[in-house]
C-alpha cells in the first residue's frame, strides 16, 4: 500500500519500487488462473461473462481514486471530502464478501478473485465489511499495482530512519521499555503499540474507564509464516502465475470462505488460504544466481502453536506440481513465535485487532480523535488506530497531525 499512501508520497523517499506485470494471480485446479493486472480493461476481459460486472464495480472507484483515497485512509467517522464517491464505495464495502461476490459475479473465476482479496480482512467472508477489503485491494491493483521495494522491505525502514535522522531525530534500539516513566521528559509521547501494551506501559495514569475499553479490544486470527529457499522458480501449472508478485492460493470462493471461517472459529483448516509472494522473479538480487525464494503465510486461530508447513506446501503443490522438489530450506514461525518476536502481534494477529464493524468505527475507542487518549500528551499510532494495518504509514501520520493540532 506504500505506493498509494499520501504520507509516503509526501516524503519523496528514494525507493525503487518493483511492479510485476500483474498484482496478483489466483490459480485453479484445472490448470488455469485469473490475474489482476494494472489494466482494469485487460483484467475485466479475462473474466469472460463477468467482464461487464467487473467494469461496473471497479471503474467508478478507479476514476474517483484521487479524492477517494483521502477518505478511505482516515478514521471511518469523519467529515468526507468526497461524499458521493465515498457513499458509492460504502454501499458495497459494508457488505459481506461472500454473498456480495456471489450476487455480483456469475463465474467462479471472478468470485474467487474477489474472495482472495477480501480474505486479507482476516474475517469470515460472511461478516459485514469483509467486502471492503476486496474492493480496496482490487482497486489498488488498478491504480498503483501491488509493487514492492527493490532489495526487500528493510529498505523502507532504512529510508524512514534516514529521513528522521536528517531532521535531528534519534533512534534507540535494543532496549525494553516497561513503563512510560522510563522515557525521557517530553511534551508528547506517541506509542506504536497494541492497546494491551499501552495499558501495560501507562498503568494507572490512564483513567479506569479507558483502560477497560482497551482491555475489551478484540484481537483477530493469527498467521503461520513459512519462508522457502528454492533451487528454481515455482513450477506453476498455469505459467501466467509467474507474472504476478503475489499469489492467492485457495481455489474457489467456498474453499476460501471455509478457511477463513475455520481460523476465526479456532480450527486449523486442512486446505488453508495461502498468501504467497514470489518477488525474486522480479528482484534477482534477493537470491543467489539461479535460486529463488517464496514467503508465505496462512491464517490460523489466535495464539496458535500448530505447525502448518505441510498444509501450506500441499496447497502450493496442488497448483504447482514439483514444488516440494525445489525446496532447499524452510524457516517457519507459528502465531505464538511471531508474538514472541514482536509483542505487538498479539496471538499472531498482524492487523492490530479484529477488523469487525465495531472495531473499524471505534479503533480502538470512540473518541473525537481515535489517536488521542485521556492524557493530553499521550497518543496511540499503531495499526490499532485508523486506517488499520498495512504498509502505508497513515496511522502515525494522522496521529502526529492530531497531536500537533491539539498543541
Residue ranges: model-predicted function:
Residues 169, 173-287:
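Mid-domain catalytic core of redox enzymes
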Amino acid at each position: 500500500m506504500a505506493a498509494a499512501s499520501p504520507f509516503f508520497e509526501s516524503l519523496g523517499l528514494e525507493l525503487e519500487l518493483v511492479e510485476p506485470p500483474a498484482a496478483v494471480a489466483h490459480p485453479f485446479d484445472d490448470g488455469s488462473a485469473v490475474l489482476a493486472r494494472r489494466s482494469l480493461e485487460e483484467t475485466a476481459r479475462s473474466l469472460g461473462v463477468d467482464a461487464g460486472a467487473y467494469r461496473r464495480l471497479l471503474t467508478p472507484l478507479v476514476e474517483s481514486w484521487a479524492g477517494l483515497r483521502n477518505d478511505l485512509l482516515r478514521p471511518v467517522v469523519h467529515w468526507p471530502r468526497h461524499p458521493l464517491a465515498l457513499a458509492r464505495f460504502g454501499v458495497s464495502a459494508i457488505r459481506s464478501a461472500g454473498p456480495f461476490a456471489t450476487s455480483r459475479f456469475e463465474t467462479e473465476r471472478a468470485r474467487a478473485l474477489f474472495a482472495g482479496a477480501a480474505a486479507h480482512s482476516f474475517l469470515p467472508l460472511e461478516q459485514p465489511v469483509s467486502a471492503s477489503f476486496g474492493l480496496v485491494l482490487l482497486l489498488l491493483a488498478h491504480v498503483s499495482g501491488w509493487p514492492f521495494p527493490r532489495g526487500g522491505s528493510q529498505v523502507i525502514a532504512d529510508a524512514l530512519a534516514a529521513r528522521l535522522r536528517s531532521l535531528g531525530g534519534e533512534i534507540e534500539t535494543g532496549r525494553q521499555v516497561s513503563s512510560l516513566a522510563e522515557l525521557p521528559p517530553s511534551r508528547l509521547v506517541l506509542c506504536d503499540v497494541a492497546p494491551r501494551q499501552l495499558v501495560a506501559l501507562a498503568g494507572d495514569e490512564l483513567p479506569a474507564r479507558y483502560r477497560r475499553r482497551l482491555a475489551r479490544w478484540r484481537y483477530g486470527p493469527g498467521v503461520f509464516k513459512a519462508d522457502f529457499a528454492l533451487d528454481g522458480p515455482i513450477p506453476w501449472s498455469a505459467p501466467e502465475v509467474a507474472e504476478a508478485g503475489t499469489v492467492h492460493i485457495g481455489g474457489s470462493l467456498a474453499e476460501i470462505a471455509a478457511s477463513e471461517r475455520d481460523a476465526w472459529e479456532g480450527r486449523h483448516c486442512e486446505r488453508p488460504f495461502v498468501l504467497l509472494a514470489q518477488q525474486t522473479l522480479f528482484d534477482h538480487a534477493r537470491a543467489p544466481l539461479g535460486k529463488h525464494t517464496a514467503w508465505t503465510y496462512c491464517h490460523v486461530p489466535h495464539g496458535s502453536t500448530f505447525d502448518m508447513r505441510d498444509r501450506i506446501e500441499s496447497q502450493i503443490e496442488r497448483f504447482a506440481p514439483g514444488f516440494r522438489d525445489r525446496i532447499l530450506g524452510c524457516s517457519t514461525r507459528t502465531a505464538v513465535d511471531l508474538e514472541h518476536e514482536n509483542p505487538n502481534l498479539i496471538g499472531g494477529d498482524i492487523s492490530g485487532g479484529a477488523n469487525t464493524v465495531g472495531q473499524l468505527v471505534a479503533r480502538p475507542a470512540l473518541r473525537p480523535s481515535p489517536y488521542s487518549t485521556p492524557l493530553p500528551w499521550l497518543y496511540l499510532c499503531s495499526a490499532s488506530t485508523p486506517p488499520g494495518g498495512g504498509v502505508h504509514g497513515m496511522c502515525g501520520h494522522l496521529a502526529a497531525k492530531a497531536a500537533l493540532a491539539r498543541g
